[in-house]
């Protein structure tokens, strides 16, 4: 299962770019309506479950994106199930910048090597394992999401 829990560890060791951006917005008072983090969205047999912090901070966006996936015909890629929480770049956007941001990240609950998939952080984590159908499902889902706004 992806890393869970309320302790995000040392904030000086992860998501440095999003920490900096959330703390130093490019315009004073800048406020985006929402954010969508795409993390490792091209893997073979990827499925994108509801991520805990996404539902905690931006439930309406989770609902909108997963609904858009169903409308676009990609509900098999976006199951209506919880997949645990992950300490990722969307946390500083939510917690520091106060912009509702979701994380679309694969979760492989049956994978023995890693819940992020069998090639994650291995020498096999390369372009040979990118699936054009998964990328299409995510891309078309995002187009449908924007259409529904």
Where are the model-predicted features located?
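Acidic/histidine-rich catalytic neighborhood of metal-dependent amide-processing enzymes
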Residues: 1-60
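Active-site-adjacent substrate-binding region
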Residues: 34, 41-149
């Amino acid at each position: 299962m992806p890393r869970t829990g309320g302790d995000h560890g040392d904030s000086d060791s992860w998501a440095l770019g999003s920490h900096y951006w959330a703390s130093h917005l490019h315009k004073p008072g800048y406020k985006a309506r929402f954010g969508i983090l795409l993390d490792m969205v091209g893997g073979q047999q990827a499925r994108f479950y509801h991520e805990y912090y996404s539902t905690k901070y931006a439930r309406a966006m989770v609902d909108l994106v997963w609904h858009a996936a169903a409308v676009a015909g990609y509900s098999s890629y976006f199951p209506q199930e919880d997949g645990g929480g992950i300490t990722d770049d969307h946390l500083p956007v939510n917690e520091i910048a106060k912009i509702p941001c979701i994380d679309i990240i694969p979760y492989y609950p049956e994978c023995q090597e890693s819940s992020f998939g069998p090639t994650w952080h291995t020498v096999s984590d390369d372009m040979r394992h990118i699936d054009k159908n998964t990328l299409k499902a995510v891309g078309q889902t995002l187009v449908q999401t924007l259409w529904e706004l």
